């Protein structure tokens, strides 16, 4: 997957002047959406606007002329439904182009990128078929080829860290312990086996409805690449489960969870929230890892100079935010939008109106406070262009390890005791605050690309499979989780032999 050098992203040293105009031939186009083999729910690529002197725009280009993109089947005889919304302006001279295919283009695609009447960069781009859509079940048999296509990183620090506790995985120990330790009526654990790229599962405990989210991402991954055979348990609850230390007897069990903590040993996967929004982007959800990049509100100079928070009452510090806001309205605008845990506080603190997430970015500073565990909004806040003030927390998600305080965000104490001080600092050090916000945004754009989520998932399953001490099996009570077999999944997979050849 072609990408611009990090230096170009971080500091476009030669920037176009205020009166410059976009040069279509000199502008750049890159990204996985220009590769046939990079199968994603929503395919996407980037445009960098460049002027006639070869200088990059670092803010939205002037004038009314917009980039226009047409994606169509290479063959006029092949009808393929493709949804192509307008390119998203990321307010930094770059644009994000998305398209969702509802059928496979067996002959291929033609992508035309225009600025005015002129073709951009090397447009038109020809993607030789087949170009598969999300629901085509056609996995790449060679995982190395698939990982190279998506430019998967050589390693993920959080994965390496998580597996230090598990040089070997004893499936027999897990089969004995997990049902008794975590599978009671209050449990939210699902037991999975993947064999021959088919997914089987059984539920343990009463609260396992969220298995729909683990099912959908595993099925999506299995449609793209052949998965290793393995047997594992996923925790669908909020809190990580395994608190045994490495030297304990018996030792810790490798439970897979969506959130980790400093005192637990769970293996972490990207949250169901980011995977579901990735799968349903441009269809069932409006707020996803791509759409937020083109909806970051006013430019930095025009944002309201206050810290901002809206959310449920899922942690007491959130109530403290509202009290601080009432006492310091010139620094902080905070409100609770729904009461469940502290219903008795609603009369005292009031209830704020719901507002669209993209409107959060009208404010210069975003306060990120834990909910029951790590706040699911954090990745989306980091993709905006506001400065994130992040509460110190024992909880973390899969990408936190790459983010550093004072480089990507501004830390605030667990008890919020220094929040107002940090807001004042940001107001008094505007350029430094802006720099931290931009550094955080660029790093989040890299860490939270949809291909990185798939790469991460695969790498966890691969590492786990390598450590199994015995063969995975389909256990009593397990059922097959089928791939979609309705009209949405129709395609001819070139990797599968025709049925006549198999007879």
UniProtKB/Swiss-Prot annotation:
**Pathway noted in the entry:** Protein modification; protein glycosylation
State the similarity comment: Belongs to the KDELC family.
Name any Gene Ontology BP term: protein O-linked glycosylation via serine
Task performed by this protein: Protein glucosyltransferase that catalyzes the transfer of glucose from UDP-glucose to a serine residue within the consensus sequence peptide C-X-N-T-X-G-S-F-X-C. Can also catalyze the transfer of xylose from UDP-xylose but less efficiently. Specifically targets extracellular EGF repeats of proteins such as NOTCH1, NOTCH3, FBN1, FBN2 and LTBP1. May regulate the transport of NOTCH1 and NOTCH3 to the plasma membrane and thereby the Notch signaling pathway.
Known glycosylation sites: 56, 302
- Specify whether Ion transport is a keyword of the entry: no
Record keywords: Signal included? Answer: yes
Cell location: Endoplasmic reticulum lumen
What reaction does this catalyse? L-seryl-[EGF-like domain protein] + UDP-alpha-D-glucose = 3-O-(beta-D-glucosyl)-L-seryl-[EGF-like domain protein] + UDP + H(+); L-seryl-[EGF-like domain protein] + UDP-alpha-D-xylose = 3-O-(beta-D-xylosyl)-L-seryl-[EGF-like domain protein] + UDP + H(+)
For this UniProt entry, the molecular function terms from Gene Ontology, in alphabetical order, are:
EGF-domain serine glucosyltransferase activity; EGF-domain serine xylosyltransferase activity; UDP-glucosyltransferase activity; UDP-xylosyltransferase activity
Matching Pfam families: Filamin, Glyco_transf_90
Where on this chain is Prevents secretion from ER (motif)? Answer: 500-503
Source domain of life is: Eukaryota
Spans of the Filamin repeats are 19-129
Of the GO CC terms on this record, one is:
endoplasmic reticulum lumen
Sorted keywords for this record are:
Endoplasmic reticulum, Glycoprotein, Glycosyltransferase, Signal, Transferase
Q: Tell me where it mainly resides.
A: endoplasmic reticulum
Organism in which the protein naturally occurs? Mus musculus (Mouse)
In terms of SUPFAM superfamilies, this protein maps to: E set domains
EC assignment = 2.4.1.-, 2.4.2.-
- Chain segments annotated as coiled-coil in the UniProt record: none
Which range is the signal sequence, renumbered to this chain? Answer: 1-19
Instruction: Spell out the protein name for this chain.
Output: Protein O-glucosyltransferase 3
Which SMART domains does the annotation name?
CAP10
């Amino acid at each position: 997957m072609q990408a611009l050098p990090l230096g170009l992203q971080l500091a476009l040293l030669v920037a176009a002047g205020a009166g410059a105009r976009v040069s279509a031939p000199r502008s750049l186009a890159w990204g996985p959406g220009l590769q046939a083999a990079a199968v994603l729910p929503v395919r996407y690529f980037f445009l960098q606007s460049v002027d006639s002197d070869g200088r990059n725009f670092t803010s939205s280009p002037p004038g009314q002329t917009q980039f226009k993109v047409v994606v169509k089947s290479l063959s006029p005889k092949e009808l393929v439904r493709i949804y192509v919304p307008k390119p998203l302006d990321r307010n930094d001279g770059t644009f994000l182009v998305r398209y969702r295919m509802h059928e496979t283009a067996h002959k291929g695609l033609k992508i035309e990128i225009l600025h005015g009447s002129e073709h951009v960069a090397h447009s038109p781009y020809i993607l030789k078929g087949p170009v598969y859509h999300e629901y085509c079940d056609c996995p790449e048999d060679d995982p190395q080829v698939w990982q190279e296509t998506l430019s998967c990183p050589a390693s993920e620090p959080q994965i390496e860290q998580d597996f230090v506790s598990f040089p070997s995985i004893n499936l027999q120990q897990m089969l004995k312990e997990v049902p008794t330790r975590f599978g009671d009526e209050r449990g939210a654990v699902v037991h999975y086996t993947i064999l021959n790229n088919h997914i089987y599962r059984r539920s343990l405990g009463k609260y396992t409805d969220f298995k729909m989210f683990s099912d959908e991402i595993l099925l999506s991954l299995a449609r793209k690449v052949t998965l290793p055979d393995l047997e594992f348990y996923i925790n669908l609850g909020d809190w990580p489960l395994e608190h045994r230390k490495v030297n304990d007897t018996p030792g810790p069990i490798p439970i897979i969870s969506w959130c980790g903590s400093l005192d637990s040993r769970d293996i972490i996967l990207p949250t169901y929230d980011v995977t579901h929004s990735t799968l349903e982007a441009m269809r069932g959800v409006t707020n996803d890892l791509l759409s937020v990049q083109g909806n970051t509100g006013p430019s930095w100079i025009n944002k309201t100079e206050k810290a901002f928070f809206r959310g449920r009452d899922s942690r007491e510090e959130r109530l403290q935010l509202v009290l601080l806001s009432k006492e310091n309205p010139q620094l902080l605008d905070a409100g609770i939008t729904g009461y469940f845990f502290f219903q008795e506080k609603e009369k005292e603190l009031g209830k704020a109106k719901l507002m669209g997430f993209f409107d959060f970015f009208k404010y210069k500073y975003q306060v990120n406070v834990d909910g029951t565990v790590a706040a699911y909004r954090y990745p989306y806040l980091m993709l905006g262009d506001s400065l994130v003030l992040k509460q110190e927390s024992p909880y973390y998600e899969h990408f936190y390890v790459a983010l550093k305080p004072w480089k990507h965000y501004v830390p605030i104490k667990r008890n919020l005791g220094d929040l107002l001080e940090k807001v004042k600092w940001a107001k008094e050090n505007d350029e430094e605050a802006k720099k931290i916000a931009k550094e955080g945004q660029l790093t989040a754009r890299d860490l939270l690309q949809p291909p990185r989520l798939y790469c991460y998932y695969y790498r966890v399953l691969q590492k786990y499979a390598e450590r199994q001490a015995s063969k995975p099996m389909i256990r009593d009570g397990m059922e097959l989780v089928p791939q979609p077999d309705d009209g949405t999944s129709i395609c001819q997979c070139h990797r599968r032999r025709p049925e006549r050849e198999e007879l």
